[in-house]
Amino acid sequence: MGIFPGIILIFLRVKFATAAVIVSGHQKSSTLSHEMSGLNWKPFVYGGLASIVAEFGTFPVDLTKTRLQVQGQSIDVRFKEIKYRGMFHALFRIYKEEGILALYSGIAPALLRQASYGTIKIGIYQSLKRLFVERLEDETLLINMICGVVSGVISSTIANPTDVLKIRMQAQGSLFQGSMIGSFIDIYQQEGTRGLWRGVVPTAQRAAIVVGVELPVYDITKKHLIVSGMLGDTILTHFVSSFTCGLAGALASNPVDVVRTRMMNQRAIVGHVDLYKGTLDGILKMWKHEGFFALYKGFWPNWLRLGPWNIIFFITYEQLKRLQI
């Protein structure tokens, strides 16, 4: 009979141990659930909404930038002619020759791009910052730049197919045929998955530069204006900060942006090699065939777009942040 108390004792020990493991597991699960519920979803949603508003408001300027950047290519007969002398000339000529709707050629994939790119970019940027520092006062330029570069690369890579279609629709204007979904399918059927991610490297490089410059410059400028007592957390502060970061972003990103635009606009043709094999190759070829300042083609519309785009975006974003949701 002495064996039964031993068996019972072992059984009870196993049951208590199992119960302890289960309780511990529930506690860890509860902690994890609490941490997950603590993740802030607002930067993702607000970033996407503000990006869509800013994109729609500045799209015609972005279209003229694309037209200016693709023209004058001595090694691509489709865009060899220099049709536009500048941003305003391009706006008036496109309106006169193609109609007002041509100024919004590519708006559908552009808004789709911002719905994905803008949402992911701002959400990841804000989330990464909170991983490094808990308080806004502890943020530094270096930390913000690292977070900006990472969020820019991830978001632009995911949204690349919409960028490809947008640029092709902008470049061809009223000559572009087909719907947005049909055009995605056509690119995939004719050029494969590679076609949808054509130019993804310079796109990610540009995004790393733009986001890695714009968002940190905005945050640091805003922080300085508020902490120094020059301005409070007002719309004027948001305006000055966004204008400054737009100029900084345009200066830093324009050369890569020109190459990216041309790489996305070139098509895969059997028996032909790509005109530009990569960012560095594109920059060197443009410098050689068109001169150094070709790298800053479309700079004024680029800045005049990034300036108003950032102003609209950040003011909209800051106002959304104040909503009691």
Swiss-Prot record:
Signal peptide: none annotated. Pfam families: Mito_carr. PROSITE patterns: SOLCAR. Solcar repeats lie at residues 42-131, 139-224, 233-323. It is a multi-pass membrane protein. InterPro entries: Mit_carrier (IPR002067), Mito_Metabolite_Transporter (IPR050391), Mitochondrial_sb/sol_carrier (IPR018108), Mt_carrier_dom_sf (IPR023395). It comes from the Eukaryota. GO terms for biological process: inorganic anion transport; regulation of cellular response to oxidative stress. Coiled coil: none annotated. GO terms for cellular component: mitochondrial envelope; mitochondrial inner membrane; mitochondrion. Its main location: mitochondrion. It is found in: Mitochondrion inner membrane. Keywords: Membrane, Mitochondrion, Mitochondrion inner membrane, Repeat, Transmembrane, Transmembrane helix, Transport. Mainly expressed in brain, particularly abundant in cortex, hippocampus thalamus, amygdala and hypothalamus. Highly expressed in heart and kidney, but not liver or lung (at protein level). In the nervous system, expressed in cortex, basal ganglia, substantia nigra, cerebellum, and spinal cord (at protein level). Homotetramer. Belongs to the mitochondrial carrier (TC 2.A.29) family. Transports inorganic anions (sulfate, sulfite, thiosulfate and phosphate) and, to a lesser extent, a variety of dicarboxylates (e.g. malonate, malate and citramalate) and, even more so, aspartate and glutamate and tricarboxylates. May catalyze the export of sulfite and thiosulfate (the hydrogen sulfide degradation products) from the mitochondria, thereby modulating the level of the hydrogen sulfide. Also can mediate a very low unidirectional transport of anions including sulfate, phosphate, (S)-malate, citrate, L-aspartate and L-glutamate. This is Brain mitochondrial carrier protein 1. It comes from Mus musculus.
